[in-house]
Amino acid sequence: FYSEERVTFLQTQAGKKYVLDSTLEKVEAQVDPEVFFRLNRKYISHVDAIEEVLSYSNSRLKVTLRNCADTDILVSREKVTDLKEWLDR
């Protein structure tokens, strides 16, 4: 799931995109936190969509998602520990 210019989208692993009549906050409350994680203000990712996680400047992480054109998905310092714990499950 991602948000762009106040519009929320669902993107499948096959790359298809669908517009949702919802906010990311509402989506986050509805999805299973065991398999979905709020990466930042713009992205919620399924565990299987995460291709790579790299250390980035200022104690942040850079996440690469499968079938995603945005290559600079940054996770804030505040969420780094939560993301690492979530991935280690």
Indicate residue ranges for each PLM-predicted region.
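C-terminal output/interaction extensions
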Residues: R77, T81-R89
